[in-house]
Design a protein with these regions (language model features):
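Short Gly/Ser/Thr- and Asp/Glu-enriched loop/turn motifs at secondary-structure junctions
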Residues: 31-36, 167
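Conserved anion/nucleotide-ligand pocket segment
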Residues: 1
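Short alpha-helical segments enriched in small residues
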Residues: 47-255, 260-264, 269-276, 283, ...
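A short linear hydrophobic-aromatic micro-motif
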Residues: 23-28, 158-162
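Short beta-strand-to-loop capping motifs
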Residues: 4-6, 38-44
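Membrane-proximal helical "anchor" segments flanking the first transmembrane region
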Residues: 13, 34-40
Length: 288
């Protein structure tokens, strides 16, 4: 049995339909939320192996394990294999992860369970200070973005998780060196599993599931910096600048006309006519 998270059930069905007849393989799958379990059957070991390989290749990023492997165990394995340290930037993210990762072999090596991050009496306030949030900031997403990035820098971890809790949903944030992954999870879904999946994919450098966004480091820094409102420009400023340029050009033209006519503006039309007629080609002339 193969275990997928974030894969579309219809995509699994299409892959199974494309199994060549000579494999003599079939599959049954069941989805619960974002998780899909696929049970394979074949009349020969080679057919079973080829069918499993086809699914692994088609859903390489979604596949997190086989048999009795759980998603939390797959996350710990991915963090250990790629030597990544995971922390939480706030209590909301800690509540999602700590209960699911505790008692797993090796979890304490890759996850701090809040001991050196948000729950530490010294590090917690330092994270808030480094987040540089204005006192009047009430946007949960901006708070989560700022804390996730600040916590990763303060602790020196590879990955930092945060959770922005809102009335009808929550936004999961995972900060890494390149930026922040974000995913909005409705109230009816399981945010803990989605956060675990985002962590697993990031640790293994695999593509994220459809619907998970990414904010590059520079944009994320600007977003959590909460820049003040830009000064408003007066609506007539552009018109005034245009009129000023036109007035300047008119003044320059007047000075040129004054010099050309020796101060006699009445002679300007006649002199312009004379200037133009001198340059009109006459019969028999060669135009150079």
């Amino acid at each position: 049995m193969l275990r997928l998270f974030g894969a579309q059930s219809t995509a699994v069905g299409k892959t199974v339909e494309n199994f060549p007849p000579q494999w003599r393989a079939a599959a049954q799958w069941k989805s619960r939320g974002a998780e899909t379990l696929v049970a394979l059957q074949a009349q020969s070991p080679s057919g079973l192996k080829k069918a499993a390989q086809a699914l692994r290749q088609a859903f390489s990023a979604d596949l997190y394990g086989a048999g009795e492997t759980t998603l939390p165990a797959a996350v710990v394995e991915a963090l250990e294999r790629h030597d990544k340290l995971l922390i939480c930037a706030d209590a909301a993210a800690g509540a999602l992860l700590e209960a699911r990762l505790e008692n797993l072999p090796g979890a304490e090596k890759v996850f701090d369970f809040g001991a050196v991050s948000y729950a530490d009496p010294k590090t917690g306030p330092l994270i808030e200070k480094r987040a540089r949030l204005p006192k009047d900031c009430t946007d949960p997403l901006r708070q989560a973005l700022a804390r996730a990035q600040a916590a990763r820098r303060v602790v020196g971890a590879d990955l930092s998780a945060a959770c922005a809790e809102r009335e009808n949903d929550c936004v999961l944030v995972l900060s890494c060196r390149k930026g922040c992954f974000l995913r909005t999870v409705p109230a009816g879904e399981n945010p803990a599993l989605w956060l675990l999946d985002i962590i697993r994919r990031t640790a293994a450098n695999k593509p994220q599931a459809e619907g998970t966004g990414f904010l590059p480091a520079r944009r994320a820094a600007k977003k959590d910096a909460l820049p003040g409102p830009q000064p408003k420009r007066h609506p007539l400023r552009r018109v005034c600048m245009t009129l000023l340029v036109l007035a300047l050009l008119a003044a320059l033209a007047a000075v040129g006309a004054w010099e050309y006519t020796n101060g006699n503006f009445y002679a300007l039309p006649e002199q312009l006519h004379t200037l133009l007629t001198e340059h009109v080609p006459r019969p028999g002339a060669t135009l150079v």
